[in-house]
Swiss-Prot record:
Pfam families: Ribosomal_L21e. It comes from the Eukaryota. This is Large ribosomal subunit protein eL21. The lineage of its organism: Eukaryota, Amoebozoa, Evosea, Eumycetozoa, Dictyostelia. Belongs to the eukaryotic ribosomal protein eL21 family. InterPro entries: Ribosomal_eL21, Ribosomal_eL21_CS, Ribosomal_eL21_sf, Translation_prot_SH3-like_sf. SUPFAM superfamilies: Translation proteins SH3-like domain. Gene3D superfamilies: 6.10.250.3260, Ribosomal protein L21. GO terms for biological process: response to bacterium; translation.
């Protein structure tokens, strides 16, 4: 049991770089543009020590509330006891990447807009709400065309 409680205690594997991912970072890491309201995933990059988030925030998703030349301000919900607190932290862009959590939602919004525009042109109304899957339709099994399989338990044999 470890007895040190430092800022990066127990992060030997958490902050380590992946297999064949060591060395210099790709230039896209620095050239990304973050805008206010973007959803981002915080993933600490071990070989950049500046602006590294606390280990609690590693793997969390938050929303950008501030953009500075080298860092991004992110709001993250943190559970403290029975309540959830919105924490504001600044993280360097090396430790942040755009999140795909909203991709399906944004795709659905675009499809809905397209469907509504086409329906208006045709003079119709289209329902864009999501509905749960309906039960499957019933059908009759024809015994003449069906091959039956008899299922039996395997006979137990004592092997010594």
């Amino acid at each position: 049991m470890p007895h040190s409680f430092g800022l990066r205690a127990r992060t030997r594997y958490l902050f380590s770089r992946g297999f064949r991912n060591h060395g210099l970072l790709q230039t896209t890491t620095f050239l990304r543009t973050f805008r206010l309201g973007d959803y981002v995933d915080i993933k600490a990059t071990g070989n950049v020590h500046k602006g590294m988030p606390h280990k609690f925030y590693h793997g969390r998703t938050g929303r950008v509330w501030n953009v500075t030349p080298r860092a991004v301000g992110v709001i993250i919900n943190k559970r403290v006891g029975p309540r959830i607190i919105a924490k504001k932290i600044h993280v360097r862009t090396e430790h942040v990447k755009p999140s795909n959590s909203m991709a399906a939602h944004l795709k659905r919004i675009q499809e809905n807009k397209k469907a509504v525009v086409e329906a208006k042109k045709a003079g119709k109304w289209v329902d864009v709400r999501r509905n749960p899957a309906a039960p499957k339709d019933g059908f009759f099994v024809n015994p003449r065309n069906t091959e039956f399989v008899e299922v039996k338990p395997v006979k137990y044999e004592l092997l010594l």
